[in-house]
Amino acid sequence: MSLFDWFADRRKEQSVVKVAQEPEEGDGLWSKCPECGQVVYRKDLLANASVCSNCGHHHRINSAERIALIADEGSFEAMDEALAPTDPLGFKDRRAYADRLRETQSGTGLRDGVITGMCRVDGIPMALAVMDFRFMGGSMGSVVGEKLTRLVEQATAKRLPLLIVCASGGARMQEGMLSLMQMAKISGALERHRQAGVLYMPLLTHPTTGGVTASFAMLGDLILAEPKALIGFAGRRVIEQTLREKLPDNFQTAEYLQDHGFVDTIVPRTQLKSTLANLMKLHGCLQGSAAV
């Protein structure tokens, strides 16, 4: 067998391997929990922040739903909504990057994988960014990096606490180095935010991996996570093959990282807003303390 044939066979093998994803909920009256199999009335599930009342499984939610759970009603004001990605490298693998962008934008109604803006939480002004995994796996490209950096700089200038809700597969490979450099750019802005003595809290949701984990997701004053969220850099299989040993079953979960000091606290989604408000008050962030 030639080397070319070997690679061709490998590609065929890899093409049938699918990443485990939560099934789409759809618009029906009932929803089945992928964790415990319980069938739940969809209206009740949504009323409970899309958390299974039987087993506590946190269903994946989109950026708009996340903002509605965190921000006081009517307080969120989006920033930089016009920013949209281009295709500077003319990248193409099985499909052209430009085609992927158009399709994803059409399917999600988003320009890119993060929404940023200012809001209030229990009356306290806060800068908020929410990544959306529906947009190319929440991957971090140049627009995601630029929007996050601008938000951090605004939070620093206005001395506002900052929350970034992370949900990402990592850097966007279709943008090459333009994607990777966002790690340093965002981290630099966060360092200036830290030097200003202002609170930054990342919330790690399922999944948070790759270059996002290796940069702004782990730079918080307080690192929060949702229960059982997948959090890591490289994939489990890659690590096992490198170390040549079996990893614990709960490896790369929020609970494992908390036990080993990488996560400060795990916050159930139904308690998130009150927890954020209490943490900000504890750090001296007062209601109406700054203009949003």
Curated annotation (Swiss-Prot):
Keyword tRNA processing assigned: no
Compartments, record wording: Cytoplasm
GO molecular function: acetyl-CoA carboxylase activity; ATP binding; carboxyl- or carbamoyltransferase activity; zinc ion binding
Enzyme Commission identifier(s): 2.1.3.15
Keywords, sorted A to Z: ATP-binding, Cytoplasm, Fatty acid biosynthesis, Fatty acid metabolism, Lipid biosynthesis, Lipid metabolism, Metal-binding, Nucleotide-binding, Transferase, Zinc, Zinc-finger
Pathway note: Lipid metabolism; malonyl-CoA biosynthesis; malonyl-CoA from acetyl-CoA: step 1/1
Membrane-spanning segments: none
GO biological process: fatty acid biosynthetic process; malonyl-CoA biosynthetic process
Essential cofactor(s): Zn(2+)
Alphabetized Pfam families for the sequence: Carboxyl_trans (PF01039), Zn_ribbon_ACC (PF17848)
HAMAP family recorded: AcetylCoA_CT_beta
Protein name: Acetyl-coenzyme A carboxylase carboxyl transferase subunit beta
Organism encoding this protein: Synechococcus sp. (strain WH7803)
